[in-house]
Amino acid sequence: MDELDIAFFILPLGIMLLSIVGTCICKNPYLMPMLSLVISLVLTFTIFNQSFLGWAVVYSLVSLALSYITLIVVRKRKESGN
């Protein structure tokens, strides 16, 4: 497994999964995007190079969007009684 597999397959899927699960558990839409940004920044400067910095921001924005969508879905399900 090389760095590109990690950067463009495993990391995005992991961030998406953790964003959904973390938002369901913590009910805080900002926690998981911040955590994904920190993880991506650490990986940028340890495993990847500075060109991955843009992807770190993109993955954090995707995490923020998924966190808000998850929070809305959880609240709607709670309101409907399911």
UniProtKB/Swiss-Prot annotation:
What GO cellular component entries does it have? plasma membrane
From the record, give the transmembrane residue ranges.
4-26, 31-48, 52-74
> Which UniProt keywords are listed?
Cell membrane, Membrane, Transmembrane, Transmembrane helix
Q: Provide the membrane topology annotation.
A: Multi-pass membrane protein
Domain of life assignment:
Bacteria
Write out the annotated subcellular location: Cell membrane
Say if the entry is tagged with keyword Transport: no
Pfam families named among the record's database cross-references: DUF2651 (PF10852)
Q: Is Membrane found in the keyword set?
A: yes
**Record-given protein name:** Uncharacterized protein YbeF
Instruction: Write the gene name.
Output: ybeF
